[in-house]
Amino acid sequence: MENYAKGNVLRVHCYKHNGKIHRTWDKTTVLDETDDYLVCGNNKVKITESTKRTHRTKETAIVFFYKRRWFHVTAQFKTNGLFYKVDIASPFLYDEGVIKYIDYDLDVKIFPDGSFRVLDKNEYKYHRKLMKYPDKL
């Protein structure tokens, strides 16, 4: 059963296309939900990488996880302005308190002045062949 009530604390699991866990967030708080997306917020949360290395996010962030779109958007509140990161990813699934999605490597970082940079192009090219990403990506 889905439990997206405002204020609920969930976890986040990010997978790769081959089904292996890529990273996890220990918590995120539900801020809102619509028919299209789930909005969550976090601040200095613990992230565990697939290598078991852990670190904490440096700033407050709000994430829009989409139910039917192949990306999600993170707004990062940094000391030098508001940054956005758009991650190419599967629509999320909810499973017993965990938001789950597949990461497809490509990201777009948008700076406070509106400029942007596409990130991880080489990682995408490599994983696309290795993991046989669908052509529609």
Language-model region placement:
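Charge-rich, low-complexity N-terminal segments
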Residues: 1-58
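Short acidic-glycine loop/turn motifs at beta-strand connectors
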Residues: 33-35, 77-80, 110-115
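Short, well-ordered strand-loop elements centered on a beta-strand within folded domains, enriched
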Residues: 38-41, 80-88, 115-122
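Short, surface-exposed beta-strand-loop junctions and turns on beta-sheet-rich folds
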Residues: 45-48, 92, 124-125
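A short, polar/proline- and glycine-enriched secondary-structure boundary/capping micro-motif
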Residues: 49-54, 96-97, 127-131
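Phosphate/ribose-recognition catalytic cores of enzymes acting on nucleotide-derived substrates
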Residues: 52-93, 106
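Short loop/turn motifs at secondary-structure junctions and domain boundaries
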Residues: 98-102
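A hydrophobic, small-residue-rich beta->alpha segment in the mid-to-C-terminal subdomain
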Residues: 104-137
